[in-house]
């Protein structure tokens, strides 16, 4: 009772206790005694009444229960002073240290009605609790050994709509078992795309022959949200994102396809009271950089894999078109640098001469010495062909032709330069029988931060599904592993250069005046918004809330709100640019290709 009260005070909505917690799992043949069975029943009634004072919280407890002359190992769902349902353990182990068949009968599919303390209660292995009017929070139960079998009941539960699986367990500790248990629970939550609450026995059990460590776990879709340290008997709390679970299942067209008919049995949906809605401080961790692993070893492995995907995508395109020359507009910025590095790798795999990589630098009104020099040095260190074409004269002629005043620095002024550059790249591609390699990244495409038919257009966009926050790490990884000190120094300086299209004149001291993140907002925010919106269908209100948690030490709520509005408006307004994107390789779970992941009007 104290634990139930404590859970309520901690604003828990669902509380789970271990298998047979009312009596203890290690009673052995005492389970055959009428006194123990009767007292367990009486304790259930007592706990049922006790939950009446904690409105809107579901409590799941375990006990031995007699039905039709046989004893079952069951879980009982209690809420608002009522017993919502009873679920029996389906798989009774009788091997190694387990001899449960000596006392318990296996559970059954389907459901029957039993009377407990004057109330009709559903009892059976095909029971799902649906809370109030919510069509998302659906709870089902399996007990300990059920999970360790080849076909756990949770598979049936999930395929019939359960989004949260509760497992009441009495899993003892042996060498290495906790690691296996952790992977088992985590893996099942991933396989079933569900929340999985695993509550197991601890210090309250006998240690006659086995020891229990209270290794409690809460997982969600392959992620461990909370884990108790063994032998501490601590309760763990976590926030399960049911919206995310439902979004992922909705996206997966194969979630319930080609399933055996016995998996799609007639389930009983028990309508429960609403879970209490309370404002609480989320305990869930939200990564500020969801595209970038925190661990360096994992991050380096991710970078290598992404570079391989980009490289082999381009390699195949070059082979298929019998193309031995490429054309890249080199600005000295992040995106063109990454595109060049990928192209170099592709040429090396194909044993093509790097001189076939035509790097075109096209300085104009906003070009600074820093970016220009980095572009030149980088091209030289990589052994590619460098061509410099100053476009000031041609852009001025274009302004004169269309009647635009060069002193008016508006969108015409900026985009005229971008389209002039693209025209030059396309013509040089024809001149060299080559292919224009696109440099734009996914973050820019999500925001529409590209000139339509300017830098927006190419013949193959190698960065099209790489977010800006990841571009930096890819270049850093290349700099750290290229074994060329001079090239590495150039790449590091590129990383230190502010992101800019350099379409407006520089400051008087020659530094970059036009900084992208001052205009459209921080890319770390936009990548966070993009990831959660496209990957999990998170709406603006929820997105604002979780962004405030993730960036609590970086941005004020007002700043986050400002850039969230910017992202949302630009994302939908700029779809026309994404509708005609060039081909490019998908590298992660989020992409904006109109032919693949993002098909929207």
Question: Could you describe each region identified by the protein language model?
Answer:
Residues 1-329, 345-354, 386:
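Enzyme catalytic cores with a strong preference for nitrogen-chemistry domains
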